[in-house]
Amino acid sequence: MRNAILCAGLLLNLAACNGTDRTSPTAPPSPSPARAAVSGWVWDSAFRPIAGTRIEIVNGSDAGLSTIANSSGQFLLRGNFDAATQINATKEGYIGSSHALGALCASCALYFFLDLTTPPVNIAGDYTLTFAADSTCPDLPDVVRTRTYPATISPATRQNGSASPAFRMTFPGVRLLEGYDYFDIFVAGDYVVFSVDRDEGSALIEQMEPDSYFGIAGFASTSVGTALSNISIPLAGAFEYCKKRTSASLGCAPDATLRCESHSHRLVLKRR
């Protein structure tokens, strides 16, 4: 009897090896979302942090999980994330914004830009713009200590929830280098930021003489109320005077450059 049982077992094993066992293989389980952390920042359309913004997962296994942005607009949200995870940023008084994570990264960071529900102040028009150097910049020659230009502010094409500017300032008729002949203006409500900056360098470069140039870089901001007419505000940045160009790429030797950085330069704007 014992030999018969052993033989029967052997026959069953052989049958399985010969493919007579028709049991279908089971598909591997779908990977579950990865437990991770997503960090980021929330700003308004003038790059001010928005404290108290609610950051919430709106789909997937952790739908409803949320956190609150701190006083710097920064947040950290832990949960189960995959490429389809949708995260919303909302706060009263602002138009909410949403991000889909897409392909996960090793250290994901999200950037939300929320527009106020109230429209931004309209500052379009023709102006006279003056840059005045800080009095603590004794090395700058008088010719570049104060520079005045006719200027025009025009609306820029932007989308809600983006980091794009609301306006652009140009200088018709002024001898500025191509690509360094404008700067952008960001607006949130009645708060205005003049971004006189191009890749952390001068946004405006004026040709003074055939081989001498004046450049200015910096940021200035203020609240203008219901309209922009006349303002005089601090400009944090640098005035730079190149006494003699050393190459076709506008390189200026250190001994031919006069530069002054300060938080107390002035930007003066008067409507014409």
Labelled PLM ranges:
Residues 131-235, 239-244:
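Predominantly extracellular/secreted and cell-surface proteins with exposed
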Residues 36-38, 44-60, 82, 139-143:
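Short, ordered, surface-exposed loop/turn motifs in non-cytosolic proteins
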Residues 74-84:
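Short Pro-Gly-centered beta-turn/loop motif in secreted/extracellular proteins
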Residues 86-102:
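A short, solvent-exposed loop/turn motif at the edges and junctions
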Residues 36-44, 73, 112, 127-129:
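A short, amphipathic beta-strand motif
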